[in-house]
């Protein structure tokens, strides 16, 4: 007999840094998911990724308290900020894009860097080839105030 699906949830967790403290612990605990089991499984699956990179994760949980997780690649904005070399600013000490995209340019990247980002994100994008993926990432770059040269 198949497991009975109870629900699913989305979390963005830094790679290799899942721990029982907030926000991960309470979000899982109130749904009856074994927190330590999840943290160990997540950290094992993300050990090959860059540590600290935000990983969007879809967690599906079942009536018998078991779960499955689908870990996606970090957001395009993470790769773009890293490639552009944006420095952390503001209260939360995080890198930021332009306040008025289209009028203001905060940084620039090369088309080679754009291609590398598109190739890394290809598995999560609904693009048929790398050229289409590059156009999607280019749109994200423009909306952040990052110019693509070359």
Curated annotation (Swiss-Prot):
Domain of life where this protein originates: Bacteria
Posttranslational mods: One or more lysine residues are methylated.
Protein task: Forms part of the ribosomal stalk which helps the ribosome interact with GTP-bound translation factors.
UniProt feature coiled coil, ranges: none
The keyword Nucleotide-binding is assigned to this record: no
InterPro entries: Ribosomal_uL11, Ribosomal_uL11_bac-typ, Ribosomal_uL11_C, Ribosomal_uL11_C_sf, Ribosomal_uL11_CS, Ribosomal_uL11_N, Ribosomal_uL11_N_sf
Gene3D superfamilies associated with the record: Ribosomal protein L11, C-terminal domain, Ribosomal protein L11/L12, N-terminal domain
Similarity remark: Belongs to the universal ribosomal protein uL11 family.
A cellular component annotation (GO) from this entry: cytosolic large ribosomal subunit
Pfam families tied to this protein: Ribosomal_L11, Ribosomal_L11_N
Subunit structure: Part of the ribosomal stalk of the 50S ribosomal subunit. Interacts with L10 and the large rRNA to form the base of the stalk. L10 forms an elongated spine to which L12 dimers bind in a sequential fashion forming a multimeric L10(L12)X complex.
Annotated protein name in UniProt: Large ribosomal subunit protein uL11
């Amino acid at each position: 007999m198949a497991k009975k699906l109870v629900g699913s949830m989305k979390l963005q967790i830094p790679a290799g840094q899942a721990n029982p403290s907030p926000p991960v612990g309470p979000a899982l605990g109130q749904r009856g998911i074994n927190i330590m089991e999840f943290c160990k499984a997540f950290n094992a699956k993300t050990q090959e990724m860059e540590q600290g990179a935000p990983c969007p994760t879809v967690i599906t949980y079942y009536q018998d308290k078991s779960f499955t997780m689908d870990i996606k690649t970090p957001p395009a904005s993470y790769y773009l900020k890293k490639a552009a070399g944006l420095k952390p600013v503001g209260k939360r000490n995080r890198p930021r894009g332009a306040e008025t995209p289209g009028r203001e340019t905060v940084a620039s990247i090369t088309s080679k860097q754009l291609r590398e980002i598109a190739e890394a994100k290809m598995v999560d994008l609904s693009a048929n080839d790398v050229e289409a993926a590059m156009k999607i990432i280019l749109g994200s770059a423009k909306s952040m105030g990052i110019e693509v040269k070359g």
